[in-house]
């Protein structure tokens, strides 16, 4: 609207200027007026028009100043023949306009020079109108003085408005307020309407997009349906030809259906497998039915084979190095001395466990490779899981209807699905047969193992009465445990531990191996791919066990101090030898009875020669302690680790509690029949046997320790970062073919 008004005003000004010039006596042909057309043509100065502009300026100023004055003003500059005269003419016109502005005849303006230079635009038209209006007044005054005196011109409207300004001001303000309110109301309505339309547009756009997507989806489904219909029609014709031409189809269909039903019937057994001790073995988790026997046997072999001088020198070197490290950290060597001896002894044990891969059988005289039962079960179960996953993938083919087994039967050759399914089932049957062989051999070995355990039990029960004073005082042992439970730590470590460890290195244990070597067919390669990662896991396990040993170091310090006070200065050599001899037996019994704490739970990642004995933990394993010892509060796994130290715990067992250690151990190897007779409710390994003689307090004590000793999963994720990556056994040819298929 504003632009239209400005254009209308420009046109009115130009038309009024032409009218004034015509009144002053301008020739109509100059502005293009003919005899017939009475209205002047406008828009002549929209573009630069210096010729017409100079002519109009000369005419208006000549009319204003008279012929005599104008001849003087425009001498030598009019008429214009070149650009120099044009510049001089504009200078003369600028001087006359400045004079008129100084007299008040024209309003002042800063754009006179540019307007005169261009001779176009609304400002130049306004200048011509102002000059023509002023010239018309002056000419009218000079020509008709009597008329001017009798009929004076009215005063300008600007002066009248100024005289009534006081009255018009409040009215103008009120009108401004009213217009403002009206504008704000209209603006608010417009904003609301715009928001409403915008929301409606968004909703319509979203609905349109949804409809487009639905249309595209329905179109795709329609195309799929048409393709499927055509495919079914084509395959139906081929199938009809096959049914009519072949007589073996019914037999193949029935066989395939029977095989498929057997696979689908056994599909639910994988979920039960994932929650039992077999899966604990595969995932390297700690379980109460499992203990690494090879590490303890290797430690006993090494302790009997290493000379005393070498062991003492190794102890001194390790003690010095550990003392230097400890002095750099906190400057307390006394709290570290005992721990350095234990670490050096266990370092020798771990080094010796590598040598037990090819152990010489004393009775047969031939070298038999030690078979890791846990590793065998782990790899077999891993293969079975891969086969199970492949069967599930086959089960999902064709939307759950099973694979098209008879697709290529018409070609005269065997189907690829038939071959893969037959190979899968054959390998499944082979693994199950291998499991049965393992179970049978474990049953054959179990009487010898139990016989060895019973002989060790009889030897422990027939201990001579000439024991060191430590074993005779049960009250002193209970007071040691009470001081250990209450957390009182005594400073200083006795050197008797070093003497005891060095003495243990000279004693030969008669029964080194409690179980004959398992003889199994060579089913897997001797160097699995998981050995490298197992080594990494073993390093992390060693670090975790060292942390737990550091935590329980203060508790062992207090007990060792009490032992050094109660022990005489000079023990007889035969008594010390017998004491250490029986103590080493108790080490093995403690390892077979009491599992390690959660900190050392990953000792299953040792080398391939480690043996694993599946012995259930019964309540009688804890009934050998006195009643006041059971009443002590235990402080988590650290207290249990210190309680299971065989160096000072086992000799404190009274004779009345010793016979009940192995009295309630169930026949675990008979429970392995559950691999054959599978029960969905009980799992694979059932916990058989419970202590009916134990009191309620003993039963509650066993329940508490059961939760501590058999955690379902270690909560320290740093120790289990790549536990499941160790399951990647080498692929067999059948598995590789299944994966490619």
Curated annotation (Swiss-Prot):
Keywords: Cell cycle, Cell division, Coiled coil, Cytoplasm, Cytoskeleton, Microtubule, Mitosis. Contributes to the assembly of the acentrosomal spindle and phragmoplast microtubule arrays as part of the augmin complex. Residues 313-335, 520-578 are annotated as: Disordered. Part of the augmin complex composed of 8 subunits. The complex acts on microtubules and interacts with gamma-tubulin in spindles and the phragmoplast. It comes from the Eukaryota. Residues 538-551 have a biased composition (Polar residues). The keyword Electron transport does not apply. One of its GO terms (molecular function) is microtubule minus-end binding. Residues 213-239 form a coiled coil. GO terms for cellular component: HAUS complex; microtubule; phragmoplast; spindle. This is AUGMIN subunit 6.
């Amino acid at each position: 609207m504003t632009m239209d008004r400005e254009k209308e005003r420009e046109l009115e000004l130009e038309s009024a200027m032409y009218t004034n010039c015509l009144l002053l006596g301008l020739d109509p042909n100059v502005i293009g007026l003919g005899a017939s057309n009475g209205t002047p043509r406008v828009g002549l100065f929209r573009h630069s028009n210096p010729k017409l502009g100079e002519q109009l300026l000369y005419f208006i100023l000549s009319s204003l100043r008279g012929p005599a004055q104008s001849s003087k003003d425009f001498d030598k500059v009019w008429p214009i023949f070149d650009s120099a005269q044009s510049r001089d003419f504009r200078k003369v016109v600028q001087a006359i306009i400045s004079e008129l502005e100084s007299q008040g005849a024209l309003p002042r303006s800063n754009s006179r020079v540019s307007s005169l230079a261009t001779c176009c635009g609304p400002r130049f038209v306004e200048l011509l109108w102002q000059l023509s209006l002023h010239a018309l007044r002056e000419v009218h005054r000079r020509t008709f003085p009597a008329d001017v005196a009798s009929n004076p011109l009215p005063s300008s409207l600007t002066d009248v408005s100024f005289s009534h300004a006081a009255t018009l001001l409040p009215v103008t303000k009120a009108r401004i307020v009213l217009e403002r309110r009206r504008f704000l109301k209209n603006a608010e309505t417009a904003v609301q309407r715009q928001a409403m339309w915008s929301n409606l547009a968004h909703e319509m756009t979203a609905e349109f997009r949804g409809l487009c997507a639905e249309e595209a989806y329905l179109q795709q489904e329609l195309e799929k349906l048409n393709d499927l219909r055509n495919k079914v029609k084509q395959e139906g014709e081929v199938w009809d030809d096959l049914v009519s031409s072949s007589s073996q189809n019914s037999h193949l269909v029935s066989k395939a259906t029977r095989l498929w039903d057997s696979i689908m019937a056994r599909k639910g057994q994988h979920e039960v497998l994932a929650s039992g001790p077999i899966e604990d073995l595969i995932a390297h988790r700690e379980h109460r039915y499992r203990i690494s026997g090879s590490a303890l046997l290797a430690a006993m072999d090494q302790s009997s084979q290493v000379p005393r001088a070498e062991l003492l020198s190794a102890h001194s070197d390790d003690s010095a190095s550990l003392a230097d490290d400890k002095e750099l950290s906190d400057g307390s060597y006394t709290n570290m001395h005992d721990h350095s001896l234990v670490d050096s002894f266990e370092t020798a044990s771990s080094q010796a466990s590598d040598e037990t891969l090819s152990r010489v059988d004393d009775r047969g005289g031939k070298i038999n490779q030690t078979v890791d039962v846990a590793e065998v079960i782990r790899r077999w179960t891993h293969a079975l899981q891969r086969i199970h996953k492949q069967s599930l993938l086959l089960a999902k083919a064709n939307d759950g209807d099973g694979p098209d087994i008879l697709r290529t039967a018409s070609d005269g050759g065997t189907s690829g699905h038939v071959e893969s399914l037959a190979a899968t089932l054959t390998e499944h049957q082979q693994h199950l047969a291998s499991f049965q062989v393992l179970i049978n051999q474990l049953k054959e070995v179990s009487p010898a193992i139990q016989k060895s355990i019973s002989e060790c039990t009889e030897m422990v029960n027939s201990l001579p009465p000439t024991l060191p004073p430590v074993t005779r005082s049960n009250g002193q042992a209970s007071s040691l445990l009470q001081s250990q439970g209450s957390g009182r730590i005594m400073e200083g470590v006795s050197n008797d531990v070093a003497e005891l460890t060095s003495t243990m290195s000279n004693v030969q244990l008669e029964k080194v191996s409690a179980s004959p070597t398992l003889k199994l067919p060579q089913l897997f390669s001797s160097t699995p791919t998981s050995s490298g990662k197992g080594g990494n896991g073993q390093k992390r396990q060693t670090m975790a066990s060292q942390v737990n040993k550091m935590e329980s170091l203060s508790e062992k310090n207090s007990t060792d101090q009490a032992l050094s006070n109660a022990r005489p200065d000079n023990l007889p050599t035969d008594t010390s030898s017998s004491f250490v001899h029986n103590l080493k037996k108790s080490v093995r019994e403690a390892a077979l009875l009491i599992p390690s704490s959660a900190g050392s739970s990953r000792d299953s990642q040792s080398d391939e020669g480690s043996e694993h004995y599946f012995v259930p933990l019964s309540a009688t394993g804890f009934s050998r302690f006195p009643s006041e010892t059971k009443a002590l509060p235990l402080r988590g796994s650290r207290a249990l680790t210190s309680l299971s130290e065989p160096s000072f715990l086992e000799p404190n067992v009274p004779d009345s509690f010793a016979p009940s250690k192995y009295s309630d151990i169930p026949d675990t190897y008979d429970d392995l029949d559950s691999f054959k007779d599978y029960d969905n409710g009980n799992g694979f390994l059932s916990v058989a046997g419970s202590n009916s003689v134990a009191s309620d307090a003993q039963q509650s004590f066993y329940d508490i320790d059961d939760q501590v000793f058999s955690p379902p999963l270690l909560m320290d994720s740093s120790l289990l970062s790549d536990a499941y990556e160790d399951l990647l056994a080498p692929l067999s040819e059948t598995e590789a073919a299944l994966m490619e298929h």
